[in-house]
Amino acid sequence: MLELQNITKHYGTKLALDHVSLTLKNGIYGLLGPNGAGKSTLMNIITGNLKPTSGRVLWDGKNVFDCGAAYRSLLGYAPQQQGLYDTFTGIRFLSYMATLKGIPKKEQKGEIWRVLDYVNLTEKAYRPIGTYSGGMKQRILVAQAILGDPHLVVLDEPTAGLDPKERVRIRENIRNISGDKIILVSTHVVSDIESIAKEIILLREGKIVDHDTVPSLCRKHGDVQNLEQVYLQVFGEEEIHDGSHTI
């Protein structure tokens, strides 16, 4: 179980997160909000890459910032398309990441081919990442995030900039990861999270304004029909994406 207790984050005088509290158990969660809401800051704190100004992040009751490598071994993280080694082949990139994650050498080959198969990239394994399409790059990031079968998977904008066909593939990959894992997906593409998330977390100006299932959110916010309408109720005419255009 992942718990966030009164997380606050300041960048100088700018308040990025304001007393955020959250409890996540197994399942897929969507972190939804407009640009500048604090989504990336929150995810960086959850992954241990950024310390909060105040508050605690607990994994099974233990402060993650005291756990070091033990917490990182439980975590899989896929940032937006950055940090990729374009001259590396897909298999070399995953081999490198498997070593960083501490996966024993004798287990790496089987694990790498498992995740490549999972994201349908076995045929592209020996191609340089620089030749991959945007969707392939996102899928190789998802693959490295699930290396070693982590208990917590954090995906930052996994469908950003992709065409509809690739977005569907990524959604299916994410849906199939679930089970005995906590999966947190940050996005501002409403349609990409509505169909797969157990619960939606709505974030605005560093605060959680609601957290519930999609049907419950629809009932609470004007008895509307879908998550896009909830978004409009909560955030007004701020930036909203349905996957093909901005409203």
Where are the predicted features?
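Conserved ABC transporter NBD signature motif
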Residues: 55-66, 70-71
